[in-house]
Amino acid sequence: MEIRKKPNIFTVLVIDFSSKPSMALLLAILLFLSGPSASAVAAAAVGPATGFKPADDILIDCGSKSSSKTPDGRVFKSDQETIQYIEAKEDIQVSAPPSDKVASPIYLTARIFREEATYKFHLTRPGWHWVRLHFLAFPNDKFDLQQATFSVLTEKYVLLHNFKISNNNNDSQAAVQKEYLVNMTDAQFALRFRPMKSSAAFINAIEVVSAPDELISDSGTALFPVIGFSGLSDYAYQSVYRVNVGGPLIMPQNDTLGRTWIPDKEFLKDENLAKDVKTTPSAIKYPPEVTPLIAPQTVYATAVEMANSLTIDPNFNVSWNFPSNPSFNYLIRLHFCDIVSKSLNDLYFNVYINGKTAISGLDLSTVAGNLAAPYYKDIVVNATLMGPELQVQIGPMGEDTGTKNAILNGVEVLKMSNSVNSLDGEFGVDGRTTGMGKHGMVATAGFVMMFGAFIGLGAMVYKWKKRPQDWQKRNSFSSWLLPIHAGDSTFMTSKGGSQKSNFYNSTLGLGRYFSLSELQEATKNFEASQIIGVGGFGNVYIGTLDDGTKVAVKRGNPQSEQGITEFQTEIQMLSKLRHRHLVSLIGYCDENSEMILVYEFMSNGPFRDHLYGKNLAPLTWKQRLEICIGSARGLHYLHTGTAQGIIHRDVKSTNILLDEALVAKVADFGLSKDVAFGQNHVSTAVKGSFGYLDPEYFRRQQLTDKSDVYSFGVVLLEALCARPAINPQLPREQVNLAEWAMQWKRKGLLEKIIDPHLAGTINPESMKKFAEAAEKCLEDYGVDRPTMGDVLWNLEYALQLQEAFTQGKAEETENAKPDVVTPGSVPVSDPSPITPSVTTNEAATVPVPAKVEENSGTAVDEHSGTAMFTQFANLNGR
């Protein structure tokens, strides 16, 4: 937040939230500057404030020989009174003539540094602190302050980099206030002023003031996809805008924390669509979870609603545009309070930021618990979604959900420190640039998720130790297996197998029952060297059975509730699924409360390992197509091959496993969900893997088979580009594979980013068809995405185009050789049912496969990668 003020030669105070301050704002400020009586009128207009006593309240009037009292009643100490804070080889004190029209006496003096100077403050209590820096470049005979260029740094953060007031301001003679919110973890806080070579640094006043810990919680919501975001306390913030929507200017003495709130009119895109509403501040009642320190009653007592929302077409949004820096992430705090409804549960609306849905179907009655009850929401907007302006919009829901209206009471826009802990520019305190940063938003989210997992694990350990004595009886592995499928699968008992185990085995069709000793022997007593995978359930080991068969042994961790839940789900799913392109369950073990599942061993491991990261021989384009086709068959079977469709919910390249012949099989059904007959979605908490998650699933928390389609689209791009879905080490625009690849696709230059190993080997038409399939999978809305059957059809066609291309090149090569007749040679007919007619290797005539019918039960040859798939795989399984 910047505050500009003019003394005698600079006559007005301007709060610089944009380049065009409104007339209402200027009038309110002039009232404030006119004297105590006017201030009292302004205070009465906005109402009383709830006080907060900061542990640290350091106010310095730099360059002053005596203390100064500001119009809001605060006292700033002089240089002599604060000499213990400053470390400087030399400094120059300058002043301007006194004037009754100066906004505040702190702008009449300044301190100038020609070399680096440091203020060191000993804090009473570490934690969140406001840091406010005041600047005004008034004329003096020592130095032209308008040309001063300098940086301001803390031990960890860059607050200002090569700051020059004439560049920062449309009016270089106006005062500027920079406001920051920093979480100080040490008892000492250092503030360094570093002038540029042959220049100087200056400062008029400094504030270091404690802020309440609850002002910034550690968690919020990330935008697009909408997902929980943790770690907000790890950032520093610059207050850029603080807006009282639909209300007047609120001066510091009328705010609960001495903040300034400006009116919203200069940011409102179309005033004709907005209507101001208000109530008395005393009508605002804070719920227990919202402290009055978040925002005063006067913010929540005013709002903007949709103009004429009851009489005109309500299908419009009210928009506010805020100039911003697209190089930074932003924390947007939105304030809501339902002061327009006459009854509960009558107002539902959507909130959008930069065109993306930030909050869908906001029901203030539910989240706030009452009418006139404050509620706020923190939204983190990644720099990849930023432009020169930040846009906030409110609008009604597009369905019959009560009154067609939407409201907003307040907006705060805070710039977040970047990957090198800078709030201004790309250089960190240690000279690193953002290009060298080791973490960004995605990496931070990943770290926080891992940290949360450790916290959850600790809670589970505590719960495990406190378990009742009869826990084992009530929670044996077999006890929670539900008799889902009374199949007729044959089974074998192991040596010493119990009747109880055989009963569950035959009921569930789980295959062979293994004793614990058998699996210990098979895995060398679960030796660490045998681990081939790790998940929330526990470890996966490679094992060798008595007959030499290699298996994958998944051993559950009883201390992980997530693992138990996923085990239950996986057993329920696998007990009724049999398909060539789904990993098969061989058997299980529940001895001594163990939770162990035994699967067929996939010797070539995850698909991802063959694309990047493992230095394995690169796959050909045909091999990649066949693997994608096999995976698509498996997913299509899940969606349509059972009475109840199944949504995998965690489709990714590590969950597509390859056997010794590179046949693809979909694995890991721990997050899968059944879809009841007649339903097209499942309302459920958002789960999955970052980078693959369906954005619509995030927004609506409604899981559909199109969520799998979206994730599979990301897998297709991995196959084409041979890089991870998310890579935080890359430049910002390349972090997300789906977004990056689609940008190149729209430019018609996708071939520029494909795996270099594929260069010159792909038929352009095959790649075009493949890329079109991926693009359709990645549509924002599920209704616009194809079914897995449609995806499979397109992949089959891409494969046929590639095979025709390859055959055409082979024929050209053969025709270029001299004719040689080999005695006894006999022409061999092509066993493939497709005989492409190749005119040239540029354009091969390929029969288009018949469209896949979603519920076709006719079997075709699943073993041939060259067969023309006019019908679908046997959905009855085998």
UniProtKB/Swiss-Prot annotation:
In alphabetical order, the GO MF annotations are: ATP binding; protein serine/threonine kinase activity
The record's section on PROSITE patterns has: PROTEIN_KINASE_ATP (PS00107), PROTEIN_KINASE_DOM (PS50011), PROTEIN_KINASE_ST (PS00108)
Span-the-membrane segments of this chain are: 441-461
Q: Which top-level enzyme class is recorded in the Swiss-Prot or TrEMBL entry?
A: transferase
Q: How does it sit in the membrane?
A: Single-pass membrane protein
Q: What is its EC number?
A: 2.7.11.-
Q: Where is this region: Disordered?
A: 808-844
Report keywords, A-Z. Answer: ATP-binding, Glycoprotein, Kinase, Membrane, Nucleotide-binding, Serine/threonine-protein kinase, Signal, Transferase, Transmembrane, Transmembrane helix
Q: Which GO terms describe its biological process?
A: pollen development; regulation of pollen tube growth
Where in or outside the cell is it found? Membrane
Glycosylated positions are 170, 183, 254, 317, 382
- InterPro entries on file: Kinase-like_dom_sf, Malectin-like_Carb-bd_dom, Prot_kinase_dom, Protein_kinase_ATP_BS, Ser-Thr/Tyr_kinase_cat_dom, Ser/Thr_kinase_AS
Ranges in the topological domain labelled Extracellular = 44-440
According to the entry, every stretch annotated as the Protein kinase domain falls at: 526-798
Give the UniProt entry's GO cellular component terms. apical plasma membrane; chloroplast
User: Which residues are the active-site ones?
Assistant: 650 (proton acceptor)
- Which Pfam families does the entry mention? Malectin_like (PF12819), PK_Tyr_Ser-Thr (PF07714)
Entry-linked SMART domains:
S_TKc
Positions that bind ATP = 532-540, 554
Q: Which residues lie on this side of the membrane: Cytoplasmic?
A: 462-878
Report the family membership: Belongs to the protein kinase superfamily. Ser/Thr protein kinase family.
- PANTHER family listed in its UniProt record: OS07G0107800 PROTEIN-RELATED
Full protein name: Probable receptor-like protein kinase At4g39110
Q: Which organism is it from?
A: Arabidopsis thaliana
Starting at the broadest rank, the lineage of the source organism is:
Eukaryota, Viridiplantae, Streptophyta, Embryophyta, Tracheophyta
